[in-house]
Amino acid sequence: RDIRFDLNRIEGYRNFCNKLWNAARFVTLNTENIAHNSNPSPQESLLLPDLWIQSKLHLLLQSIEKNIKIYRIDLVANSLYEFVWNDFCDWYLELTKSILYSTDHFSDDNKKQTKVNLLNVLDKVLRALHPIIPFITEEIWKSFNFVSSKRSIMVSSYPKKESLCYDKITIHKIEWMQSFVTNIRQIRSEMNIAPKVQIPILLQDASEGDLNLLNETSVFIKDMANVYEIKTITDAPPLSAISLLGGMKILIPLAGLIDIESERKRLEKKLIQIQNNLSSVNQRLENKNFKSKAPKDVVENLVSQSELLSQDKIKIERQIEMMSLS
């Protein structure tokens, strides 16, 4: 089949290589005193983020092994891309900062374990990537002195899932934490609360399971969502932006963060504009004459516009509703 040469995809893969390079640089700078052949910690002594990334890498290598056997190299490449970009760079490296830069929550032994894990995971990631992107992985291997017993990555063995710990419960715990952080970030974005502004969080209807998960992950949530306090409440909450995580309500009190009345007026004005645009687009799409005579790409473009405007309308209505909730 014909494969389109897409410049946007080329740019995306260039960004991926840059991200991988920066990740390797971060690991190297933060593990200067750690030997590359250091023995990894046993599963029971690993911190939550370290056990999580090993578990995710274990599943990745299992998936790669399966897809190589059926010659689905495309699925191998896609799964590596998703793991490196999302799990390793966007989440794990950020989680390790909470450990490495901590002044009170984590001991020196904890920090050393995480540094060893950073090196071991990056080592396996580079070796797993090497058949797909050989030049950049070889360059990283040599440029950052990422050399164990092999001078070149190409003569290193492919990583095996058996060398990694795996714990399904840990994956669930971090996924819960990710949803918690993502919900807070989404509220920040929708309510125009700057990421640099520290905020308090209130929790309503939290189950015992939620509280147990919070107890294990709160230090990471506070760092990644820039939160200075998380409290549970049973009384009526103050005027807040609300998000749901299962049956639990996550609330960000709005007093002092935004001018509520001005923001409501701005959103109501924006909603009217979106409703007018949506009505105009839908009228054209409902016109049978137009649909039968217009070029296919024009109709498809209008359908896409209608979908995007509908999504924007729902989002703005939700923001206005949140300002009225208490």
Annotate the PLM regions.
Residues 4, 8-326:
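Feature 926 captures the class I aminoacyl-tRNA synthetase adenylation module centered on the KMSKS loop
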Residues 1:
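Gly/Pro-rich active-site capping loops and adjacent beta-alpha segments
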